[in-house]
């Protein structure tokens, strides 16, 4: 099982991850959540984070992914909003329930899985000043 999780983490590891031009603060992440249509904070080797990334990828949903591993400010921001990973925001609002909630939304074709044009396009990263 660990080998499978490692392989999935390597495949989905850094796709769509926001690296930005410099060090971002918790306030910067808050601003990013307000600006972005769809954003998810993940742990690279967390099985729920891997499953959520896989689901978004398979359904063609463009969502900004922030890896919190080795990023204390991103981790602190995510943990302040939700106790487990992944931490998912849609239109600036926290979607509670993590991976399980994403599966329910996907099965019901609800946002972000309703093929809204803003969510299925590849969006350029928002660079904060």
UniProtKB/Swiss-Prot annotation:
A GO cellular-component term linked to this record: cytoplasm
Main location: cytoplasm
Keyword Transport part of the UniProt annotation: yes
Localization of this protein: Cytoplasm
Keywords of this entry: Cytoplasm, Electron transport, Redox-active center, Transport
Top-rank taxon: Eukaryota
A Pfam short name: Glutaredoxin
Domain Glutaredoxin: 26-126
PROSITE patterns, alphabetized: GLUTAREDOXIN_2 (PS51354)
InterPro entries, per database record: Glutaredoxin, Thioredoxin-like_sf
Protein's UniProt keywords contain Thylakoid: no
Recorded GO MF terms: oxidoreductase activity
Purpose of the protein: Has a glutathione-disulfide oxidoreductase activity in the presence of NADPH and glutathione reductase. Reduces low molecular weight disulfides and proteins.
Annotated family: Belongs to the glutaredoxin family.
Name of the protein: Glutaredoxin-like protein ECU08_1380
